[in-house]
C-alpha cells in the first residue's frame, strides 16, 4: 500500500535514475524529459556499483532535494549463478550507503514480483514475500537494506513481466514471440502455453512510476495490470499481427511432471492510491508494438 507525502501532484526538482541505460531506465528518462522534469541518468559507466567505494562516487553526485530511482540490476538472463547474485547484492549495498549519506528527498526502488515464491498464485499488497529463487531473495534483501535506513522516504515497486519494443531481455512472452515471428515465421511455446502470467506494458509502468514520484509516495506498489493471460493467448495475439499469421509450435516441457505455474494479482492497492490509473490491455499493447516495429523498420 502507498501513502502520499505530497497531497497534490508536484514535479520533482530532479530525478536521478541509476541504471538509466536499461529498458525501464531509458524509458523513464525519456518520459521525464518529455514532461519537462530535470533528469540525471547514471549508468555503470558513470558509477559502477559493484566496486568498493562506489557509494562515495554516487553520493557525491546527489543532492538532498533529489528523487532517486534505483534500477541497476543484473537480471536472470545475464546470469543465475552465485557470482551474479553477489554482484547484485554489492550494488544494493553500495546504493543503500549512498542514499543514506545523501539523505535524498525521495527514493524509488525497483524490485520484482520474484520476491513471491513461484508457487504463490494469488498476490495482493498483503501477500508475504517468500522468495524461493536467488534473484527474488536478492531483491528482498535489497528492500530490507533500504527500509532499515530510508523507510520514511522509500517507495518499492514490484513489477511483473514488462514488455515493449525496446526490451533487450528476450524474455519468454510478447517480446520473444514477436521476434520469433519476425525472424522465423513461427512461435515456440513450452507445452500448450497453459501458464498464466501478468504482463505490463512499459508505458504503463512508467506512468505508475511518474505518479509515485509526483506524489512522493512511500510504501509498496505492485507494477502489474490485474490480468493474467496464458502464454498461448499471448502467442495467438502476436501471431495474428503478421500476414500470414505466424505458426505456433508446442514444444515438450522441460519437466513434464512439474506443476503448471499461474500467478494472478489484486491491484486494489494501486487503484486506491491512484483511482484513475488505467492499463493497456495486452491485445492493444501487442498491436501497438507491432506498429512501432513496422514504423521503425521503414524510418
Language model feature labels by segment:
Residues 39-57:
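Adenosine-cofactor binding site in Rossmann-like domains, unifying the SAM/SAH pocket
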Residues 94-134:
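Conserved Rossmann-fold NAD(P)-dependent oxidoreductase catalytic core, especially the SDR/UDP-sugar
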Residues 3-34:
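N-terminal Rossmann NAD(P)H-binding glycine-rich loop of SDR-like oxidoreductase domains
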Residues 85-86, 127, 131-140, 167, ...:
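Short-chain dehydrogenase/reductase
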Residues 144-197, 202, 238:
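NAD(P)-dependent short-chain dehydrogenase/reductase
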Residues 52-89:
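NAD(P)H-binding glycine-rich loop region in Rossmannoid oxidoreductase-like domains
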Residues 118, 130-155:
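Active-site Tyr-X1-5-Lys
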Residues 185, 190-192, 197-299:
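C-terminal substrate-binding subdomain of Rossmann-fold SDR/epimerase-dehydratase oxidoreductases
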Amino acid at each position: 500500500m502507498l501513502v502520499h507525502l505530497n497531497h497534490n501532484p508536484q514535479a520533482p526538482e530532479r530525478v536521478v535514475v541509476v541504471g538509466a541505460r536499461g529498458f525501464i531506465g531509458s524509458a523513464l528518462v525519456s518520459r521525464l524529459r518529455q514532461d519537462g522534469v530535470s533528469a540525471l541518468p547514471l549508468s555503470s559507466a558513470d558509477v559502477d556499483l559493484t566496486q568498493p567505494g562506489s557509494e562515495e562516487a554516487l553520493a557525491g553526485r546527489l543532492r538532498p532535494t533529489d528523487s532517486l530511482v534505483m534500477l541497476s540490476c543484473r537480471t536472470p538472463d545475464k546470469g543465475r549463478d552465485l557470482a551474479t547474485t553477489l554482484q547484485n547484492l554489492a550494488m544494493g549495498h553500495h546504493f543503500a550507503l549512498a542514499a543514506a549519506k545523501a539523505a535524498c528527498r525521495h527514493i524509488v526502488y525497483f524490485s520484482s514480483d520474484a520476491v513471491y515464491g513461484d508457487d504463490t498464485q494469488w498476490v495482493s499488497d498483503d501477500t508475504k514475500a517468500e522468495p524461493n529463487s536467488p534473484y527474488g531473495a536478492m531483491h528482498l534483501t535489497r528492500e530490507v537494506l533500504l527500509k532499515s535506513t530510508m523507510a520514511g522516504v522509500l517507495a518499492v515497486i514490484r513489477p511483473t513481466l514488462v514488455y515493449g519494443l525496446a526490451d533487450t531481455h528476450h524474455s519468454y512472452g510478447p517480446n520473444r514471440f514477436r521476434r520469433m515471428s519476425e525472424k522465423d515465421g513461427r512461435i515456440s511455446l513450452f507445452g500448450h502455453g497453459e501458464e498464466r502470467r501478468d504482463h505490463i506494458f512499459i508505458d504503463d509502468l512508467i506512468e505508475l512510476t511518474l505518479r509515485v514520484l509526483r506524489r512522493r509516495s512511500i510504501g509498496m506498489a505492485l507494477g502489474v495490470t490485474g490480468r493474467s493471460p496464458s502464454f498461448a493467448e499471448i502467442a495467438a495475439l502476436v501471431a495474428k499481427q503478421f500476414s500470414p499469421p505466424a505458426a505456433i509450435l508446442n514444444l515438450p516441457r522441460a519437466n513434464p511432471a512439474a506443476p503448471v505455474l499461474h500467478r494472478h494479482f489484486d491491484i486494489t492497492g494501486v487503484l486506491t492510491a491512484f483511482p484513475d490509473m488505467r492499463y493497456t490491455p495486452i491485445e492493444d499493447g501487442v498491436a501497438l508494438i507491432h506498429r512501432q516495429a513496422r514504423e521503425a523498420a521503414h524510418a
